[in-house]
Each structure stands twice: as C-alpha cells, then as structure tokens.
C-alpha cells in the first residue's frame, strides 16, 4: 500500500523564514550564499584536512573489471564498492571478497544496479534495482526484496528507514520517498515540477555522475536530493527536517531552462546556471561540489574542470570560498605529489575519492607531477590491467 504524508506547507514556511533573513537567528535555517562563496578563492593543501594519503588498488579476479567506481562505503573492515562490475566487497587491503547479487530475474537477482547503501545497524547491503530494493547480508547472501516504485535513483538509510531520491522530472510526483521494511511509503517530499507545463514532449533528463544525494556526519543522515533543489535535509528515520539552504542567486537555474521543459533551450542556454551536486561535512567545513548545468560549448559528454566549482564553507568563520590557487583547484597533494584531491565520499575515518590508472597516468604526464618515492613505486607496478584505485585521505583529529 502506498501511503504518503506530505509536509509541503511546513517546508514552504521554513523556506520563507530562512530566505527572508540571512542570519542565524533562533528558529531560522542557516543559508549559504553561492555568490558570496565565489567571491573568494583560497589555495588549499591536503595537509589542511588529512594526516595521510593512501592509494588502494582494488584487486579482483581476472574476469571482474572493477572500473569506474560510483560509490564507496565502509563497514566491518571491508570496502563496499559500486562499479561497472556491480556491487562488491573488498577487504581492508583491497582484496576481492564477494559480489552482491547478479543480473537476472530470480530471487536476489536484479535487472539494473542503480545504487546501493549499507544499513550499519542491521549490517545489510541494500541494492536499488529498477523497481525494488534487494537486501543481502555482508557476505553476499540474499535475504529479501521489497518494492520501491519505478522512479528512485539514489538511496540512503536512517534507522533502517530507506529514503529514495528521484530525478525530480515533471512526471515524478515526489522528490524523495521514505520506505519501511515492507516497502510501504512513510513520508514523501513533493516534487514542485510534477505535471508542470512544458514546451516540448517534456521527457528530457539531465544528471551528473557526481550527483550524491546523501551523506552522513556524526552518525546523522543528510539528504540533498537533485541539484535543482537548494535545501539540505537532516534525516531522522522517517522525518526529513530542513537543515541548510543554498541561495544560488543569479546562478539559480530557472524552470524554463530545465531539461524536461525545453531540451534545446536547456542545451544552449543553461550553461549560465549552476547546481550543487553533493555535500560533505566535517567539524570545520562543508565540502560543496557544484557543476554548471550544461557545457557552454555543447560538449555535454566531455569532462571539463571549468564546469566545476569546489567550495569549502568554513563553519567557524561563517564564510565560503572556492578552492583555487597557484597550484590549481581542490586540495594540492603535499603528501605523495599526486593529482589534486577532492572528497566524494566519507567513511568516518577517511575522505574517499577514486581514479583509474590510465587517468592517473594522463594527469601525471600533463601536469608534470613528481611523485613521492612510495607512490612512484606503486605506480610502476600498475598498468592497463589495474582496476580502479581508491584514494583515502585519513582525517585529522582535533
């Protein structure tokens, strides 16, 4: 049974209260101004946030190509990694342990491995299929399946309640839905674009491979949903509480330039606008990854660093800035001499990123990097048959 509890009026009241005042008065939401963040630049080094950097090779059998990593989690001395080969577990040193499920139509099998998440309380791995959630134990044994609808793209977990985010397309009723253990919906956040008028067929979709809806900080789940949404929610089980607002100012993408409204206009005009793809946090900073809505040259399938802003928001100083200096954007690697680092995932002890060997090789040559002896020794052992590399930045502790 599909049960939905809408709290749009509460959300709108919170939004109005927060956007009417930029200060942190009691009862208002913290608001981060995107334009203010862009007004300042600062060079950052990895040693500012981490005390160690590790390159970890994922070592798998020859018939498994663990490449193009989309998500990483850590639980019980093992890495859970989502790549083009599926969702797999690796030991602490990167040795392959197991694969969760396989493609097919039987129990525990899936048609599309869209996303996954780890329930740290029940010690279960949950895979998002095209219309269901499939549960496994940490060793890869199938446990059960529940329905979740057909529009969920990303999932997160809070106290065993599964939250699913959609692409917020005009054909999807909700931005996010919470499901109980039986697959029934508990709460939903409405999609303001649902059934909105459009110029063309209204089926255009745009998303980024760097889009991350969920992150955890101090054992609390936070949800950003799609990048056109400017609210960060704090998740407590089935409750989603507006927690932080992003004021995009003149960079806010208008509805008329959404991909579903008019795809041609989106392709040719939306490059003026930006969205925040992901949020991470530690004691000092918010780590904000922002991307231009489309490429100004129409090269939408080509990665260009000019289409990204890597922003730190300093909680103590109450100000944000773009990480950019003489040595480039992001965190300069002053430990191993490798390419610049930017965190994509947070495991608690480590900030994590990933790179392919051939991308690393290209960056070393293009940027004329001088690797440390330790990293150079590792690099000399890698080649075209090397799987993806996890880059682990161990956090500094106060």
Protein language model annotation of sequence segments:
Residues 17-20:
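C-terminal motif of bacterial Sec signal peptides marking the signal peptidase cleavage site
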Residues 24-58:
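Blade/loop signatures of beta-propeller domains
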Residues 52-85:
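Beta-strand-rich domains and repeat architectures in extracellular enzymes and scaffolds
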Residues 59-64, 68, 95-122, 130:
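Blade-loop segments of beta-propeller domains
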Residues 62, 101-109, 147-153, 192-196, ...:
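Short coil/turn segments at the loop-to-beta-strand junctions that recur within blades
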Residues 67-71, 111-116, 150-159, 209-212, ...:
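Repeated scaffold domains used in trafficking and secretory/extracellular systems
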Residues 129-174, 186-203:
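Asp-box/WD-like beta-propeller blade repeats and closely related beta-sheet repeat scaffolds
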Residues 243-268, 315-347:
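Conserved blade-ending motifs and adjacent loop-strand segments that build the rim/top face
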């Amino acid at each position: 049974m599909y049960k939905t509890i809408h709290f749009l009026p509460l959300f709108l009241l919170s939004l109005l209260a927060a956007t009417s005042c930029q200060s942190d008065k009691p009862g208002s939401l913290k608001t981060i101004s995107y334009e203010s963040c862009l007004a300042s630049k600062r060079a950052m080094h990895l040693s500012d946030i981490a005390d160690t950097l590790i390159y970890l090779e994922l070592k798998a059998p020859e018939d498994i190509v663990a490449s193009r990593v989309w998500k990483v989690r850590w639980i019980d001395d093992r890495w859970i990694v989502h790549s083009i080969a599926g969702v797999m577990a690796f030991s602490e040193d990167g040795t392959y342990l197991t694969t969760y499920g396989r493609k097919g139509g039987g129990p525990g099998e899936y048609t599309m491995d869209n996303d996954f998440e780890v329930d740290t309380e029940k010690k279960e791995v949950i895979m998002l299929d095209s219309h269901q959630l499939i549960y496994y134990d940490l060793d890869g044994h199938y446990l059960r399946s529940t329905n979740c609808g057909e529009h969920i793209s990303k999932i997160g977990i809070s106290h065993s309640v599964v939250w699913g985010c959609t692409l917020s397309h005009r054909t999807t009723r909700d931005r996010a839905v919470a499901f109980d253990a039986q697959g029934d919906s508990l709460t939903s956040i409405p999609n303001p674009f649902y059934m909105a008028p459009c110029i063309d067929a209204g089926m255009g979709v745009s998303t980024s491979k760097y889009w991350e809806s969920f992150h955890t900080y101090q054992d609390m789940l936070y949800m950003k949903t799609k990048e056109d949404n400017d609210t960060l929610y704090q998740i407590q089980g089935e409750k989603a509480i507006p927690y932080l607002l992003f004021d995009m100012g003149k960079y806010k993408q208008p509805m008329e330039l959404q991909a579903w409204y008019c795809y041609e206009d989106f392709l040719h005009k939306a490059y003026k606008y930006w969205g925040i793809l992901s949020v991470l946090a530690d004691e000092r900073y918010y780590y904000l990854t922002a991307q231009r809505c489309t490429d100004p040259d129409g090269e939408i399938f080509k990665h260009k660093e000019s289409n990204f802003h890597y922003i730190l928001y300093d909680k103590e100083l109450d100000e944000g800035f773009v990480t950019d200096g003489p040595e480039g954007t992001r965190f300069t690697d002053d430990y191993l001499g490798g390419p610049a680092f930017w965190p994509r995932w947070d495991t608690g002890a480590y900030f994590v990123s990933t790179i392919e060997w051939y991308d690393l090789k290209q960056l070393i040559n293009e940027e004329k990097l001088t690797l440390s002896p330790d990293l150079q020794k590792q690099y000399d052992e890698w080649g075209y048959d090397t799987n993806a590399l996890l880059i682990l930045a161990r956090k500094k502790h106060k």
